[in-house]
Amino acid sequence: MQRNMLKSKIHRVAVTHCELHYEGSCAIDEDLLEAANIVENERIDIWNINNGERFSTYAIKGERGSGMISLNGSAARRAQLGDLVIIAAFAVVDEAELKAGWKPDLVFVDDNNKIKGSRDHVPTQNWT
């Protein structure tokens, strides 16, 4: 059996640019791409925390160290500057890979979209 699993996530990153007339895509700071194991032209899902929009596009490289998250083309209509988004990518994983310990790459950022931490799992949600 094969499963479609979360592969990569950049959590609560702020939109820094919206370029309506740029060729469609999402430019992401190269440091963030590498940390999250997302490659250029890979399909990504973007979930806007501020307005609930959910959409797909593809990743392109943004200037390394800049904190850039640029929504381009029609994606620019889905967010405003400063909106917090989650960027995710998925992979098809077989049972053997899962049993061998396959884990996702989760990246967390500060208020300037700089990496503040990473981990390989989402913690169990508990009632408080």
Curated annotation (Swiss-Prot):
Major place of residence: cytoplasm
GO biological process terms on file: alanine biosynthetic process; pantothenate biosynthetic process
Gene: panD
Binding annotation for substrate: T57, G73, S74, A75
Pathway as given in its UniProt record: Cofactor biosynthesis; (R)-pantothenate biosynthesis; beta-alanine from L-aspartate: step 1/1
Catalysed conversion reaction: L-aspartate + H(+) = beta-alanine + CO2
Residue numbers annotated as active site: S25, Y58
Gene Ontology CC: one annotated term: cytosol
Protein name according to UniProt: Aspartate 1-decarboxylase
EC number per UniProt: 4.1.1.11
Cofactors named for this entry: pyruvate
GO molecular function: aspartate 1-decarboxylase activity
Subcellular location(s) per record: Cytoplasm
